[in-house]
Structure formats: C-alpha cells, structure tokens
Amino acid sequence: MIQKVPTPITPINIDKATRHITLAYFDQKSTVDYIGAVQGIPVCFDAKECNTDTFPLQNIHEHQVVFMENFEKQRGIAFFLISFTARDEFYYLRLAKLLEFWNRAKEGGRKSFRYEELEPEFFLPKSRGVLVPYLDTMQKDLAMRD
C-alpha cells in the first residue's frame, strides 16, 4: 500500500465562493511524495517532471536525498519517478544512479543529467490509463541489490 504524503501548507487567501485556496505557503520542507510498503518492503519515492532531455538536479533537494539515503539504510527502497513529458515517457531513477549524478555535481561536474545517461532498462513500459506501472521495474532494482 502506497500513500501520498500531504504537503503541509498555511492558506493565505481562500476564495469564499468556491472554498478553494488561492494563495498559500509551505509550512516546512517536504521529504518525499509517496511512502508505504510493497510486499513487506518499505518504499518511498518522489515524482518529478521534465519537459526537456536534461534534468536539472536543482529540482531535487538535499534534504530529500538525505531522507532517501537514511530510508535505504533501514532496508527500504527509495527512488524517483520522472515524467519526460516531451517524450511521453516515465523513468524509474534508482537512488544509486541519482547519487552518481549528485556526487558528480558536488565534485564540480554537471549539475544535471541527460536523457542519454539513463539506464535503458529502467524506462517504464507504456500502459493504458492513468497508472504508472513501476512495480516490475522496482523488482529489477531489488534484484540488482542482492
């Protein structure tokens, strides 16, 4: 079971007619978008979107990376699901692969990664409907850890 983690906000303006929040600010830093367990394995992941073939690492915050590293130290599995909107493709970014890009940037290298640098076997198969079929790809990630 995977649940969406609510992002804590403080409303500033509320449209009285529709009761919709029109302006708000974040109360605190959020960790990940989703958390739960799959077949007894703790899972957390964050969803990101990219409309080009270059993903800026500034879209991922250090506190998220630290949270995910600590999550994996507790025998969980952490990853990012990235939607490459211009290509209509989803990618499962393993935390280990992200850390390669992250450490490269920390050492003065590129502060982004390119589509071509990604592992082809972690692109998600197309599916009908609105669901993102990441479970089979997560199994590949787990198999690489054994």
Where do the language-model regions lie?
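Short basic alpha-helical hairpin corresponding to helix-turn-helix/winged-helix-like nucleic-acid-binding
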Residues: 23-30, 42
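Nucleic-acid nuclease catalytic cores
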Residues: 69-99
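Conserved catalytic cores of phosphodiester-cleaving nucleases, focusing on short active-site segments
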Residues: 33-52
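Acidic-basic catalytic patches of nuclease active cores, encompassing PD-(D/E)XK
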Residues: 1-25
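Mg2+/Mn2+-dependent nuclease catalytic core
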Residues: 48-74
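Short, basic, glycine/proline-bearing loop/turn elements
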Residues: 14-20, 46-54
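Short, conserved beta-strand edge motifs with alternating hydrophobic and charged residues
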Residues: 3-5, 44-47, 81-82
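Helix-rich interaction surfaces within compact, conserved domain-sized segments
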Residues: 2-7, 96-146
